[in-house]
């Protein structure tokens, strides 16, 4: 009952074509394709935005790491001056 063969699918396709016509189905397919394309573009732009944010955060993090060793050197020189 749940298994549809090729003949059942062909009969359903013929009925759909007779009900809606080829022009309507063609325009429906074009609309569906445009929606899928828009969705893909939105997803790719979202991924690019995340990648840019990650790159920006990675660039900000090393500058903090560079300042930390300088702070350690200053404390070492203060310790030497006190001795």
Curated annotation (Swiss-Prot):
Gene3D superfamilies per record: 1.20.5.3310
Membrane topology note: Single-pass membrane protein
Spans through the membrane: 1-21
Swiss-Prot/TrEMBL keywords: Cell inner membrane, Cell membrane, Membrane, Protein transport, Translocation, Transmembrane, Transmembrane helix, Transport
Ranges annotated as biased composition (Basic and acidic residues): 47-57, 71-83
Acetylation as UniProt keyword: no
One Pfam family of this chain: TatA_B_E
Main location: membrane
Database matches in InterPro entries: TatA/B/E, TatA/E
Region (Disordered): 47-83
Gene Ontology CC: TAT protein transport complex
Subcellular location: Cell inner membrane
Record's keyword annotation contains Amino-acid biosynthesis: no
Example of a GO MF term: protein transmembrane transporter activity
Record's subunit section: The Tat system comprises two distinct complexes: a TatABC complex, containing multiple copies of TatA, TatB and TatC subunits, and a separate TatA complex, containing only TatA subunits. Substrates initially bind to the TatABC complex, which probably triggers association of the separate TatA complex to form the active translocon.
Function: Part of the twin-arginine translocation (Tat) system that transports large folded proteins containing a characteristic twin-arginine motif in their signal peptide across membranes. TatA could form the protein-conducting channel of the Tat system.
Family membership noted in the UniProt record: Belongs to the TatA/E family.
Protein name per the record: Sec-independent protein translocase protein TatA
